Amino acid sequence: MDTETVSPNFDDIRPLNNSEVKDAIEKLVANEDFERALRYIKPNLNWEEFSVAMRACKTKEEFKSTLAYDAVMTVAKNTTFSLTISGRSRLPKDKAACTFISNHRDIVLDASFLNVMLYDVGYGMTQVAIGDNLLIRPWIETLVRLNNSFIVKRGVSVRQMLEVSKTLSAYIHHAIKNVNESVWIAQREGRAKDSDDRTPVSYTHLRAH
């Protein structure tokens, strides 16, 4: 589902609209750093064929379910024994949107593995929260927003923090209630490098707003 009716107040954090997909793909196809990153995952990648496949994607959904899905499964094949999912009986029977909260051990794979497994069982992929501290290059922001991620602003002052938190909470509510897309958020800010997966109280406040 598209986010064309999103309030302008969310423009700096929301995923791309489908009307923005074509321009985003052209920027990525022309970016040498993006090409190098993909070749790291798939060394034998035929860039010309991949560029054609990229340009064939007219919506975020097409991009996610084909190229992004394939990239994640390539990583899974090369780095894991298997991917499994449990707890399917707890998913909403009517496929209604909801919030997924999980521990956070990898920058992108926690949510990526969840999304491909949800897709495989016929449940929609989630919008993914990603910290702006990871968007170290413009092409990375373009890619994650094309892949239906929304931005969590981290480097803000104490004075700005409350307003940023309210806006983020309002966006999550909008995505679930109005766009009918589930969201994924990590249960803490940053990865749990010390294996401490406890959820900060502030995250429960975020959901309550």
Give the predicted meaning of each segment:
Residues 65-69, 165, 200:
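A structural signal for well-ordered alpha-helical scaffolds and beta->alpha junctions
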Residues 87-183:
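Glycine- and small hydrophobic-enriched segments that form the cores of compact globular domains
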Residues 1-98, 104-115, 119, 141, ...:
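Membrane-anchoring hydrophobic helices of lipid-metabolizing enzymes
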Residues 175-203:
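Catalytic-site beta-strand/loop segments enriched in glycine and acidic/polar residues
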Residues 58, 62, 155-162, 194:
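Charge-dense, low-complexity intrinsically disordered segments
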Residues 204-209:
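Conserved small/polar residues in nucleotide/adenosyl-binding loops
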